[in-house]
Each structure stands twice: as structure tokens, then as C-alpha cells.
């Protein structure tokens, strides 16, 4: 590709409304341009990268035995009503009515459509297992689109769905998809982690997220220093070690009129925050127990996903308001605790090991100091309630936990029969009777992968693509003052044609621009290999090679340039 025939569209200045690095660089590199909130045009440079990522995903999915299909973006409401997600999904599901007054949606995902399709096409257990995928545009009406294509309303996604007659068969395909995703993100050259995750609104049993490590990530991911253990912070198990110490002081009721928070209490009474507990009141799952107390250590945070999974707690999790708490307990938030508490309590594992701790007295303006389990208050139910913190022991007993920010780029689920049961998707089983199909689903945000890669791989000059395979161009030819030197022009043209003949993805900067502008643009868009052709070097039979990723510079004989590049491109 010649730059004189190409829409390069780079920008010198960073747009003011771009908050994260990937959004800034995708705009500056001429990869995308905004159309409306959360909607973007993909310009040639961006589309080249997007298509290359898409091709890697497609190649690895095909290797896994999955079969590509394509389904409509527009979906009839009846399917969503049949699966019962019409009411559940919320306002991010864009609904509309056609001229025949029929309800439709713009698909944010395709569980309903694929279940309906397979139900119609597959009739016998002999046709299973089956894993179908598509790479297609999705739409979710995000309440606050931000960060460019990282969280846009329209995005490109690879979504796959597998169908089985047994859990063992599902597990086999799930394991294949797990390995396939690892292959995809390894091939993309990304630093990533596969982490245990919550199934969320999709539903099902087992689930893993694939997270690209990046400081700008929206998720906290947890992994062990000495093992393969990794989990989303929502699911990471918090281990409590040690034993409860014997009481060393008598419980004391203390006036604390100005201590409304744990920080107030710690500062005013010179307490260790590790010796305090906080009591949070949530709605109960049973009418007989409308409120439940959840108690964690003062320096820990309640994990709402873990709390919501407790059978005693209402789903979705809902905190009680001040009036409800005051009416039932007789004290305000900030003065609550387990002693003489008139509602059931569940305490975190770490709280169960505490002794001589301080807590609200369920009397406004008062706290108990030196509280001990069994002696002063019966030990309630114990559960894992908190978020892990850096340095916690790993649940597998190997090493300690580290926490980093991550960008979710892939998610795999074992759905079970959530959709097939609701939509009566059955096949004839081996015994001749109808059998509900068991499902898995596997998603990759293809356009999000592009942004996540840039978040992880960039410098002050621009993008550094993590793999030659996804760079918009793998080689750039930069001729210095080409229009003033016949020798430079001739060699640059010959090299360009030679690289094209070898199917190298090359960009030839044949603009009448200063060399500094050419270098800046090629570094900005992240071309990994640059060949610099100058009159003085050519007179010595040499050209200069620059590596965008390592910063390496090397003078090589011009006759060796093709062999030299062959050893480095995609290496």
C-alpha cells in the first residue's frame, strides 16, 4: 500500500474527550472516528487490525472443530419472551416495533436464536455434540458509553454455542474452548489470565473470564504468586488462617457519640482497624426473616456477589434503608453489631477468628469494646463474605494472592439447560425419549481485543502491536528525500515490489513529507518493522532497519534486506 493512495488520517493532537490511552491512540492513529455516542466508523487502518484479529479468532475456532454460521442481528421478541429474558434483560436491550406492529430487538447476544435454530435443525443425539459460532456485530444500549470501542454500544463479537446430551460431553467441549481461547490470546501476544468468574445474567454453572492485564482495566483480577490459581475478585475465595485467641479483657460498653464510621472509631479511640467489625443489613430471602446482618472485619469490603449467593439473602442483593434498620433494630447505621442483635447474622471467616474486637452496640452513640465470641455473643453462621486483599494466602495453599487490573476480552460459560429447557429444545435420546440439550456459550469481544491490546502495548510515540500478525502493516518503507534522489526512489520502488511479491503486508510512504513526519506516523500506527532508505547509506550499499517493538536499529547490506526481514517478520 502506498500512503499517497491510502487514507492515513493521523492526528497530531489528542482529542479532549478521549479518556483512556486506547481511545486516544485509536483516534490519533486514524483507526476510528466517532459517529454518535458509543458508535464508531472504522477507518482503513483500524479495519485492517480488526480483520486480522478476526482472522486469528476464526482460524483457531475452526481448528477446534467449531463450525461458522451467521445469524440475524434483528431478533423477534417472541424468542426473548420464550426464554423469559424479555423482562429480565433491562434497558440495554434495544427494542423496536416494525411496520406490522411486531416487537423486535437488536441482538446483544444470540442464545435464543441459536437455541431455536438448533432445535429446528437437530433431532437426534447422534448429531451432537455440535459447536456453532459466528463473528458478528452486536448492540447493547449502554447507559454511559465510554472509553471508545472498549465500551461502545455497537461492537464486533465472536459468539459460539455448543449443544450436548451429557454434562461430561459439555465439559469436554468447554475444555477445548478453554484451550482454544488460550491459543488465541497467546497468538495475539497478550499478557492475560484465565480467571474463574461469576456467570451473571447469562446463567449457568462454570465460567471463566479471559482478562488482559492493563492498568486501565475495569476489573480486579486475583492470581497466586506460586500457582495457576486465578479468579475474578467477585469469585476469589478469601481464606482465613490461624486460630482465635483467648479473651484478654472484659467486654465494655463505651460512649461513642461522634463515631459514625469505622474510621471515626479507629481515630478517636486509637484502635487497630483489624480489631473492629462492621455490620451491614440486607434484605432476607424469607418472609419470616426480612432482614439479615452481614458482618465483616473493619478493614475488609463485603463481596456482594458472594453475599447474594447465600440462601438466606434476597436475590438480587438489596441493602435495607435507614428507616427499616431503625424500626427493626432500634439503632442507626454506624452503631450496629452482633451483640443483642434481634435479626439473624452471618459473619465472615476472618471475623470468626477475632477476639477482643470492637463493634456497634445496637444503641445509637455506643459501641462495645473487647467483644469475644461464645463468651459475649454466640458464634453465628460463618461464610466467605469478603473481597480478598493483596497478600492473602492463595486458596490452593500455594503462595499469596496478587491483584491487578484487567480488561475482560473473553468469557466462557457452562449454561446447562437454562435456555434449552425454557425453549423446549430437545433431541431424541439414546433411549428413544426426548432429552433436553445441555449448552455452553463462548464469547470474545473482537473489537474490544483491539483496544485492550493498545492499552497493554504502547509508548509515548504511539501503538506497539503485541504481534506482527495484527499490525495494520508489518513493514514500512521510509525513503528519505525520495523526490530529490533517484537512487533512493529506484531502490524503494524495487523493494516495495519485492515485498508485495512475497505477500508481505507493506506500506510505502511515498508522500512528499519531511522524514520526521513519516517516522512519527509509522510509529504512531505501530508498524513493527521499518526500512529507512537514505542517499548516504545507499552509496555504501546499506539501508537502516528499525524495530518498533524493541527500539533496535541496525545497518544492513541492501542485498540482504529481504532475507533479513524474512527472519524477523512474524518471528
UniProtKB/Swiss-Prot annotation:
Q: Name one GO biological process term.
A: prolyl-tRNA aminoacylation
Q: Name one GO cellular component term.
A: cytosol
Compartment(s) of residence: Cytoplasm
Superkingdom, natural source: Bacteria
Q: Which NCBIfam families match?
A: PRK09194.1 (NF006625), proS_fam_II (TIGR00409)
> What role is this protein assigned?
Catalyzes the attachment of proline to tRNA(Pro) in a two-step reaction: proline is first activated by ATP to form Pro-AMP and then transferred to the acceptor end of tRNA(Pro). As ProRS can inadvertently accommodate and process non-cognate amino acids such as alanine and cysteine, to avoid such errors it has two additional distinct editing activities against alanine. One activity is designated as 'pretransfer' editing and involves the tRNA(Pro)-independent hydrolysis of activated Ala-AMP.
Q: Identify its protein family.
A: Belongs to the class-II aminoacyl-tRNA synthetase family. ProS type 1 subfamily.
What note about domains is in the entry? Consists of three domains: the N-terminal catalytic domain, the editing domain and the C-terminal anticodon-binding domain.
Among HAMAP family, the record links this protein to:
Pro_tRNA_synth_type1 (MF_01569)
Stated name of the protein: Proline--tRNA ligase
Q: What is the organism of origin for this protein?
A: Histophilus somni (strain 129Pt)
**UniProt lineage:** Bacteria, Pseudomonadati, Pseudomonadota, Gammaproteobacteria, Pasteurellales
